[in-house]
């Protein structure tokens, strides 16, 4: 049997039987549409990939923080912070070093220098000063719980700057300083020079300006110097602070949760964060009976600097024989050059 096959064109094929010009236009439109679709697809894929990368980084940072609970102190000490320095405050022995001489924005770690300049100046800590429009953050647009017109003593402003990292408090200390903000900044930089902080520069009293830069090595010197001030030690390690604002009590918590952790004996603390600086944390703490200065800079993720600090504590406690604590008054920090990639145990 011979079966005859009749070829019936598909509708699309039949529709394509049009004048050549029209077919050319249709093909061009199709190619343009296909190209547009590919570009859109690539953009969507790239966007999704970027978003996924951010999520993975955040997840990784959180995991690193919580992983500190499982860290045994035996395996090599590896920190997430991009720049870090851990030293014995008594002996200057370097426990851990990572990019110690790399200049980086330091955010609110700046406020330790702000407090030292005020305390060195001899101005009355009980004198009330006023928060004005000049203290509003127009650079980063950060909020504040201190309304314009708030009157507080310099002592209260120091506490708010060091405990809650209140930017208007730190700003008001500078704007109301004899000679004004410019003179205050000059004295911040003069103090840095006197401490041997050769890679440090200050442009404001809050740390919101990313041109406030320093290194892990310089900040170890600053932490050691700040530790000599009772006011700074007491304020920076206070877990919370209450003041009256507009005739109402206001409660401020310390930005470093470790001061509320019974596993830690902290003698000085300051956190910092702006996008350019990453998460920063500097501390003086007793570890295995020894005074240790910890500088953690440019850490990604809200929890990673805390995880790093916990890993440092466990490593030191596991690898150091407890020794009697020595007198810490005026212990100089004179660090030499450190290999930027070195990990010294």
Model-derived features with residue positions:
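Bacterial N-terminal signal peptides
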Residues: 1-6
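Active-site-adjacent loops and short helices of periplasmic peptidoglycan-processing enzymes
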Residues: 43-217, 221-230, 287
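N-terminal propeptides/low-complexity segments immediately following signal peptides
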Residues: 10-47, 341-344
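Penicillin-recognizing serine hydrolase domain
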Residues: 16-20, 50, 54-81, 180-345
């Amino acid at each position: 049997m011979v079966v005859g096959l009749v070829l019936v064109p598909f509708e699309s094929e039949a529709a394509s039987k049009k004048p050549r010009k029209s077919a050319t236009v249709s093909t061009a439109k199709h190619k343009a549409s296909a190209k547009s679709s590919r570009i859109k697809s690539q953009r969507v894929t790239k966007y999704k990939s970027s978003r996924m990368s951010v999520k993975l980084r955040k997840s990784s940072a959180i995991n690193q923080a919580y992983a500190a609970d499982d860290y045994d102190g035996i395996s090599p000490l590896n920190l997430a912070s991009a720049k870090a320095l851990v030293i014995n405050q008594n002996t200057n022995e370097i426990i851990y070093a990572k990019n110690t001489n790399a200049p980086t924005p330091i955010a609110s770690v700046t406020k330790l220098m702000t407090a030292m300049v005020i305390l060195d100046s001899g101005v009355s800590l009980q004198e009330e000063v006023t928060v004005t429009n000049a203290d509003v953050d127009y650079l980063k647009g950060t909020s504040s719980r201190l309304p314009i017109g708030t009157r507080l003593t310099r002592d209260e402003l120091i506490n708010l700057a060091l405990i809650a990292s209140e930017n208007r408090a730190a700003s008001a200390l500078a704007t109301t300083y004899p000679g004004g903000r410019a003179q205050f900044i000059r004295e911040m930089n003069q103090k840095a020079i006197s401490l041997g902080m050769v890679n440090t520069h200050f442009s404001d009293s809050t740390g919101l300006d990313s041109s406030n830069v320093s290194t892990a090595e310089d900040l170890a010197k600053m932490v050691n110097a700040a530790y000599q001030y009772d006011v700074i030690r007491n304020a920076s390690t206070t877990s919370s602070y209450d003041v009256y604002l507009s005739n109402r009590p206001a409660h401020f918590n310390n930005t470093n949760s470790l001061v509320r952790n019974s596993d830690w004996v902290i003698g000085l603390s300051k956190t910092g964060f702006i996008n350019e600086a990453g998460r920063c944390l500097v501390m003086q703490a007793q570890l295995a009976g020894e005074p240790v200065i910890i500088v953690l800079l440019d850490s990604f993720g809200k929890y990673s600097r805390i995880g790093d600090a916990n890993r440092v504590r466990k490593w030191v406690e596991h690898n150091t024989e407890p020794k009697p604590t020595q007198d810490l008054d005026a212990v100089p920090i004179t660090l030499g050059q450190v290999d930027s990639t070195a990990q010294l145990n």
